[in-house]
């Protein structure tokens, strides 16, 4: 297969949702980080991991019908979109873990935490040799920020959070929900609030035309 054809196959799903125009956003300025952020991130050698260009933060064209201020997650393409006005969105590359596949539909951010602690579920402990509790810090797999999703006033156990493994951005791995680089999750965290609507696309839904049912459901949550 020609190189151009291969690239089309690899990134086709993201282009459908994200459009052809894209503009890379410059790295966050120091002003975006709190003194605590700077101290903890300075102790994290993994922050120097190289992120492939398609998974760096971009502003892209956006064809779906969700309202500005909505988060849309396309696990298939490994992208999270923060919808902007005028048919644009900020597109973030993500890592997708098995827990991210347990929920699809419309939810809201029910709570938000800076530098969260982590208590692994019993299911995760069956698969992995992990401690019962990990405190906040650069070695915590939840990273610098966490947003907890609720539907019908119940915790979905679905999270959007940072990572201590940025080298896996753009990939699927064995555990976790939706992981962004710590720089990106700090950026997203500043843009959202408790009550922000999150649309989680079902598998294979992200590369289809806009889904009126999901888009209208997101509108009803406003």
What kind of feature is each model-predicted range?
Residues 2-4, 8-178, 182-222:
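N-terminal pre-domains immediately preceding structured catalytic cores
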């Amino acid at each position: 297969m020609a190189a151009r054809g291969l690239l089309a196959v690899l990134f086709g799903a993201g282009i459908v949702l994200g459009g052809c125009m894209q503009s890379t956003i410059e790295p966050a300025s120091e002003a975006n980080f709190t003194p605590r952020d700077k101290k903890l991130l300075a102790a994290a050698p993994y922050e120097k991991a190289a992120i492939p260009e398609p998974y760096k933060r971009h502003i892209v064209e956006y064809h779906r019908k969700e309202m500005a201020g909505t988060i849309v997650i396309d696990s298939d393409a490994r992208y999270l979109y923060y919808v902007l006005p005028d048919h644009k969105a900020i597109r973030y590359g993500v890592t997708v873990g098995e827990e991210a596949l347990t929920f699809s539909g419309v939810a809201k951010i029910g709570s938000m935490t800076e530098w969260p602690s982590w208590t692994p579920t019993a299911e995760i402990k069956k698969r992995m040799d992990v401690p019962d509790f990990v405190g906040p810090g650069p070695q915590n797999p939840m990273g610098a920020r966490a947003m907890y999703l609720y539907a019908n006033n119940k915790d979905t156990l679905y999270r959007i959070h940072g990572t201590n493994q940025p080298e896996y951005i753009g990939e699927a791995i064995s555990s976790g929900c939706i992981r962004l680089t710590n720089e990106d999750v700090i950026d997203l965290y500043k843009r959202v609030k408790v009550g922000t609507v999150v649309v989680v696309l079902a598998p294979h839904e992200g590369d289809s035309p806009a889904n009126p049912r999901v888009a209208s459901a997101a509108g009803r949550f406003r």
